[in-house]
Amino acid sequence: MERSNRIIGGATAPAEKWPFMAAVVSKGYNGGKGQFCGASFIGSRYVLTAAHCLDATLGEDIEVIIGQQNLSAATSEQRLSVRKVYIHEEYADAALGNDIAILELSEEFEGAPVALVEASVRNSLAAGTNLTVMGWGDQDPTDNFRGATQLQQVDVNLIAQQTCRNVGGDYAKISDTAFCAGLVQGGKDSCQGDSGGPIVVSDNGQYKQLGIVSWGDGCAEKGKYGVYANVSYYADWIANKTKGLSYDQHVYEGIVSPGIQSATLTYRNDSESELLLSNFSTTSSAQIVHNTCEQPLAIGTECQVTTSYSLLGYGDFSYDVTMDSNQGIGQVKSTVHYQSYPLADPFISDWIMGQIPNQQLSVFSQGIEWDFSAIGIMSGNLEKDQHSGIAISGIEKGQLALDMSVSSEEKFDELKIFVNGRLELSVSGEQKGTVSFVLPREKNVIELVYVKDELGSEGADRGFLNAIRYSSSLILPSAESSSSGSSSGGSLGWLSLFALLGFLRRKY
């Protein structure tokens, strides 16, 4: 099933009609180019969105624009920084429910929040009730992406739960955690890029948020519907996450060598009363070596917990740090994640460090070692079901341009590029060109992994990296013209990469 995070068949929203509407924007891109998901401001310093928008995302990777109808007109002062990201603890896949997340802004926002629908109102709504959904996403129901810089809105109908389940496939799994909306005949829907945005209903003349754009089979297709996370079902979860305890839910420590590793978690009290944090514990043999959270945490103050972990061997490693809090917050869990690989061949490392001079870098190898090509480096010579990866850790904040090419069996043998643990691009077939990435964190990790399947080979069956260019600037140049965004043929420019990064990467 082809799922889309998906406004089709609508119209431009009147200015200032939806002051709570928010855009989630990749840091380093302008509002029009960088928006990849919608969201809604729910008060104080909190923004509601979809969990699937935030795969491997930390607050420092993104910004939020609230109440701006035209994203291209948003100024830097209107871009709000994000301190923390909270994803529903039971989220695994949008089709399985729990597709909900909260962004905690670095500062309180003074704008008008959206009211959330109560369970009693949700349960009283009849099938056919008119709903309004909005976003800056795809306006073309075909495979050709056509986004919008001005906010769009469209009216759709609430669909009965059983009617939606009868569509079959993943629709059959829909429970009380979600609901469907659309038209039986199709033609109106949310679409790719609208994910995380609100769908609202008029309740005695006041618009309230009923759901969050989650997924759907295509966009605006006959007999198919958009699926939305049911906000009222998550009322307690939302209330808990907005009580004012700020903490690190997920910590990515990057790629490291085996040995003793430490991580520090920060807890901040942004509530209206003193917080008591207690019963700290860890899993997977990690130990707490320093804890400044043993005393009551006063309003507006922080405390820290430092852990030590003996990392043995290579692979992916994680452990949890849990603690209890008062004020009805209950148990809080943070997960610390490491990746460990052997160091790369020193000659390969020297070549990379020569491309990115004057930085403290570590270069690691994954699977089969990379080798030198005529003008740069290339993935190793692979047999079936093997992979060859290179990882560069410690790159400073800025942007990185890669002159690269791929020669492979289209759609089967791929070069995958990860930034800070998040898949940003998969390229196959015959491709060459330059791709650029924003590196938003103080220290960043980029990985290039060529993956070969169990079947045949075509072309050189390798990925090639010919040159690397680093800039401390965090803003990628805007582009007036769009390329196709294809990842399987022809030249590969940074703009086509962005189309993949912001949209095609998100399959819902």
Predicted segments with their positions:
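Conserved H-D interstitial segment of serine endopeptidase catalytic domains
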Residues: 24-27, 47-50, 55-90, 161-167, ...
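Protease-domain processing segments flanking chymotrypsin-fold serine proteases, especially trypsin-like
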Residues: 1-47, 57, 63-68, 184, ...
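Short beta-strands within extracellular/lumenal beta-sheet-rich domains
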Residues: 372-395, 412, 431-436, 465
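Chymotrypsin/trypsin-fold serine protease catalytic domain
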Residues: 70, 74, 78-81, 97-186, ...
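C-terminal subregion of chymotrypsin/trypsin-like serine protease catalytic domains
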Residues: 35-55, 62-63, 68, 147-162, ...
